[in-house]
Amino acid sequence: MSVDMTKWCEIAKANMGKRPAGEGRLGGKICIVTGAAQGFGKGIAEELYKEGATIVIADMNEPLAKQVAEEMGKRAVSIAVNVSDEESVANMVAQTVEKFGGLDLMLSNAGVVRSGPLAHVEKKDFDFVTSVNYTGFFLCAKYAAIIMEAEHEADPEAMFDIVTLNSKSGLEGSNKNFAYAGSKFGGIGLTQSFALELCAYNIKVNAVCPGNFLDGPLWSDPVRGLFVQYLDCLLYTSP
Protein backbone atom coordinates (compact mmCIF):
# COMPACT_ATOMS: atom_id res chain seq x y z
CA MET A 1 0.00 0.00 0.00
CA SER A 2 1.30 3.45 -0.87
CA VAL A 3 2.24 5.84 1.92
CA ASP A 4 0.11 9.01 2.01
CA MET A 5 2.30 11.93 0.93
CA THR A 6 -0.44 14.59 0.78
CA LYS A 7 1.04 16.69 3.58
CA TRP A 8 4.48 16.71 2.00
CA CYS A 9 3.12 17.50 -1.45
CA GLU A 10 1.37 20.56 -0.07
CA ILE A 11 4.54 21.73 1.67
CA ALA A 12 6.60 21.24 -1.50
CA LYS A 13 4.02 23.12 -3.59
CA ALA A 14 3.91 26.00 -1.12
CA ASN A 15 7.69 26.36 -1.23
CA MET A 16 8.05 26.56 -5.01
CA GLY A 17 9.47 29.95 -5.85
CA LYS A 18 10.33 30.64 -2.22
CA ARG A 19 13.47 28.52 -1.83
CA PRO A 20 16.79 30.44 -1.85
CA ALA A 21 18.63 30.25 -5.17
CA GLY A 22 22.11 29.67 -3.78
CA GLU A 23 25.39 29.81 -5.69
CA GLY A 24 26.79 27.53 -8.39
CA ARG A 25 25.19 25.73 -11.32
CA LEU A 26 23.04 23.71 -8.92
CA GLY A 27 22.52 26.44 -6.35
CA GLY A 28 19.17 25.99 -4.61
CA LYS A 29 18.63 22.47 -5.97
CA ILE A 30 17.69 19.77 -3.47
CA CYS A 31 19.10 16.34 -4.24
CA ILE A 32 18.77 12.89 -2.69
CA VAL A 33 21.55 10.40 -3.44
CA THR A 34 20.94 6.86 -2.19
CA GLY A 35 23.86 4.65 -1.31
CA ALA A 36 25.88 7.83 -0.86
CA ALA A 37 27.97 6.86 2.15
CA GLN A 38 30.68 5.34 -0.05
CA GLY A 39 31.68 4.40 -3.58
CA PHE A 40 29.98 5.89 -6.64
CA GLY A 41 27.25 7.48 -4.55
CA LYS A 42 29.65 9.37 -2.32
CA GLY A 43 31.64 10.67 -5.28
CA ILE A 44 28.49 11.83 -7.07
CA ALA A 45 27.15 13.52 -3.94
CA GLU A 46 30.44 15.34 -3.45
CA GLU A 47 30.41 16.66 -7.02
CA LEU A 48 26.79 17.79 -6.75
CA TYR A 49 27.65 19.58 -3.53
CA LYS A 50 30.58 21.35 -5.18
CA GLU A 51 28.14 22.68 -7.79
CA GLY A 52 25.98 24.26 -5.09
CA ALA A 53 23.31 21.61 -4.48
CA THR A 54 21.83 20.73 -1.12
CA ILE A 55 22.47 17.03 -0.58
CA VAL A 56 20.76 14.23 1.31
CA ILE A 57 23.23 11.41 1.98
CA ALA A 58 20.79 8.49 2.12
CA ASP A 59 22.20 5.13 3.15
CA MET A 60 21.59 2.08 5.35
CA ASN A 61 24.94 2.72 7.04
CA GLU A 62 23.71 5.58 9.19
CA PRO A 63 26.96 6.32 11.08
CA LEU A 64 29.00 6.47 7.86
CA ALA A 65 26.33 8.55 6.10
CA LYS A 66 26.36 11.03 8.99
CA GLN A 67 30.15 11.25 8.83
CA VAL A 68 30.10 11.90 5.08
CA ALA A 69 27.45 14.61 5.45
CA GLU A 70 29.37 16.33 8.24
CA GLU A 71 32.58 16.26 6.21
CA MET A 72 30.77 17.64 3.18
CA GLY A 73 29.40 20.77 4.85
CA LYS A 74 26.33 22.62 6.07
CA ARG A 75 24.23 21.93 2.95
CA ALA A 76 24.43 18.15 3.47
CA VAL A 77 22.45 15.95 5.84
CA SER A 78 22.19 12.21 6.33
CA ILE A 79 19.03 10.12 6.35
CA ALA A 80 18.90 6.40 7.03
CA VAL A 81 17.05 4.44 4.36
CA ASN A 82 16.38 0.90 3.21
CA VAL A 83 15.50 1.36 -0.45
CA SER A 84 13.77 -2.03 -0.62
CA ASP A 85 11.25 -0.95 2.04
CA GLU A 86 8.41 1.30 0.86
CA GLU A 87 7.80 3.04 4.17
CA SER A 88 11.51 3.75 4.57
CA VAL A 89 11.75 5.32 1.11
CA ALA A 90 8.61 7.40 1.65
CA ASN A 91 10.00 8.58 4.99
CA MET A 92 13.30 9.55 3.32
CA VAL A 93 11.46 11.74 0.83
CA ALA A 94 9.19 13.17 3.53
CA GLN A 95 12.17 14.07 5.72
CA THR A 96 13.84 15.76 2.75
CA VAL A 97 10.78 17.93 2.13
CA GLU A 98 10.48 18.66 5.85
CA LYS A 99 14.13 19.75 6.11
CA PHE A 100 14.54 21.62 2.82
CA GLY A 101 11.09 22.33 1.42
CA GLY A 102 11.11 20.23 -1.75
CA LEU A 103 13.00 17.92 -4.09
CA ASP A 104 14.63 18.52 -7.49
CA LEU A 105 16.80 15.46 -8.11
CA MET A 106 16.49 11.84 -7.05
CA LEU A 107 19.64 9.88 -7.77
CA SER A 108 18.98 6.19 -7.20
CA ASN A 109 22.43 4.71 -6.69
CA ALA A 110 22.09 2.10 -3.93
CA GLY A 111 22.86 -1.37 -5.23
CA VAL A 112 24.00 -4.83 -4.19
CA VAL A 113 25.42 -7.87 -5.93
CA ARG A 114 25.27 -11.62 -5.35
CA SER A 115 27.04 -13.68 -7.99
CA GLY A 116 27.55 -17.37 -8.67
CA PRO A 117 26.68 -20.20 -11.06
CA LEU A 118 22.99 -20.62 -11.84
CA ALA A 119 22.69 -23.95 -10.01
CA HIS A 120 24.20 -22.57 -6.81
CA VAL A 121 22.56 -19.16 -6.33
CA GLU A 122 19.79 -19.38 -3.75
CA LYS A 123 16.43 -17.71 -4.20
CA LYS A 124 16.92 -15.54 -1.11
CA ASP A 125 20.03 -14.01 -2.69
CA PHE A 126 18.27 -13.51 -6.03
CA ASP A 127 15.34 -11.86 -4.24
CA PHE A 128 17.69 -9.63 -2.24
CA VAL A 129 19.42 -8.29 -5.35
CA THR A 130 16.08 -7.72 -7.07
CA SER A 131 14.58 -5.96 -4.05
CA VAL A 132 17.43 -3.44 -3.82
CA ASN A 133 18.44 -2.86 -7.43
CA TYR A 134 15.07 -3.15 -9.18
CA THR A 135 12.34 -2.58 -6.61
CA GLY A 136 14.48 0.02 -4.86
CA PHE A 137 14.67 2.13 -8.01
CA PHE A 138 10.91 1.80 -8.49
CA LEU A 139 10.23 3.01 -4.94
CA CYS A 140 12.68 5.91 -5.13
CA ALA A 141 11.25 7.02 -8.46
CA LYS A 142 7.67 6.63 -7.24
CA TYR A 143 7.98 8.82 -4.15
CA ALA A 144 10.23 11.37 -5.83
CA ALA A 145 7.73 11.69 -8.67
CA ILE A 146 4.84 12.21 -6.25
CA ILE A 147 6.58 15.28 -4.84
CA MET A 148 7.85 16.51 -8.21
CA GLU A 149 4.41 16.29 -9.81
CA ALA A 150 3.03 18.44 -7.00
CA GLU A 151 5.85 20.94 -7.51
CA HIS A 152 5.13 20.98 -11.24
CA GLU A 153 1.53 21.89 -10.47
CA ALA A 154 2.77 24.91 -8.51
CA ASP A 155 5.37 25.89 -11.13
CA PRO A 156 4.83 24.36 -14.61
CA GLU A 157 8.17 25.78 -15.81
CA ALA A 158 10.28 24.00 -13.20
CA MET A 159 12.42 21.04 -14.28
CA PHE A 160 13.19 17.90 -12.29
CA ASP A 161 15.38 14.82 -12.65
CA ILE A 162 15.29 11.18 -11.64
CA VAL A 163 18.53 9.35 -12.40
CA THR A 164 19.48 5.75 -11.74
CA LEU A 165 23.04 4.49 -11.55
CA ASN A 166 22.61 1.42 -13.72
CA SER A 167 25.56 -0.57 -15.12
CA LYS A 168 27.16 -1.92 -18.24
CA SER A 169 25.54 -5.15 -16.97
CA GLY A 170 22.21 -3.53 -17.81
CA LEU A 171 23.27 -3.51 -21.46
CA GLU A 172 24.78 -6.98 -21.84
CA GLY A 173 24.75 -10.24 -19.92
CA SER A 174 27.22 -10.92 -17.12
CA ASN A 175 28.69 -14.40 -16.65
CA LYS A 176 27.78 -15.91 -13.27
CA ASN A 177 26.33 -12.56 -12.25
CA PHE A 178 22.83 -12.96 -13.65
CA ALA A 179 20.89 -11.68 -10.63
CA TYR A 180 22.69 -8.35 -10.83
CA ALA A 181 22.51 -8.14 -14.63
CA GLY A 182 18.83 -9.06 -14.63
CA SER A 183 18.01 -6.36 -12.09
CA LYS A 184 19.92 -3.81 -14.16
CA PHE A 185 18.23 -4.85 -17.43
CA GLY A 186 14.95 -4.39 -15.59
CA GLY A 187 16.10 -0.98 -14.42
CA ILE A 188 16.57 0.12 -18.03
CA GLY A 189 12.98 -0.88 -18.75
CA LEU A 190 11.77 1.09 -15.75
CA THR A 191 13.83 4.11 -16.80
CA GLN A 192 12.39 4.21 -20.31
CA SER A 193 8.84 3.64 -19.07
CA PHE A 194 9.07 6.27 -16.33
CA ALA A 195 10.52 8.76 -18.82
CA LEU A 196 7.56 8.33 -21.16
CA GLU A 197 5.08 8.90 -18.35
CA LEU A 198 6.78 11.66 -16.38
CA CYS A 199 7.90 13.94 -19.20
CA ALA A 200 4.44 15.54 -19.01
CA TYR A 201 5.49 16.94 -15.63
CA ASN A 202 8.94 18.15 -16.76
CA ILE A 203 10.53 15.22 -14.95
CA LYS A 204 13.44 13.80 -16.93
CA VAL A 205 14.31 10.17 -16.18
CA ASN A 206 17.68 8.77 -17.24
CA ALA A 207 20.07 5.92 -16.51
CA VAL A 208 23.86 6.04 -16.39
CA CYS A 209 25.61 2.76 -17.19
CA PRO A 210 29.21 2.85 -15.90
CA GLY A 211 31.76 0.07 -16.08
CA ASN A 212 33.63 -1.51 -13.19
CA PHE A 213 34.62 0.67 -10.25
CA LEU A 214 37.16 -1.62 -8.65
CA ASP A 215 37.69 0.54 -5.55
CA GLY A 216 33.97 0.68 -4.78
CA PRO A 217 32.25 -1.61 -2.24
CA LEU A 218 30.52 -3.74 -4.89
CA TRP A 219 33.96 -5.01 -5.89
CA SER A 220 36.26 -4.47 -2.94
CA ASP A 221 34.16 -5.39 0.11
CA PRO A 222 36.23 -8.10 1.86
CA VAL A 223 33.20 -10.25 2.65
CA ARG A 224 30.62 -9.74 -0.13
CA GLY A 225 32.54 -7.91 -2.86
CA LEU A 226 32.70 -9.31 -6.38
CA PHE A 227 36.39 -10.14 -6.05
CA VAL A 228 35.53 -12.53 -3.22
CA GLN A 229 32.40 -13.84 -4.92
CA TYR A 230 34.23 -14.61 -8.16
CA LEU A 231 36.94 -16.43 -6.22
CA ASP A 232 34.19 -18.47 -4.59
CA CYS A 233 32.89 -19.32 -8.07
CA LEU A 234 36.19 -21.08 -8.78
CA LEU A 235 35.27 -23.62 -6.13
CA TYR A 236 32.34 -24.67 -8.31
CA THR A 237 34.33 -24.87 -11.55
CA SER A 238 37.64 -26.35 -10.39
CA PRO A 239 38.10 -30.11 -10.95
Whereabouts are the PLM-identified features?
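Residue(s) in the substrate-gating loop at a strand-loop-helix junction
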Residues: 167
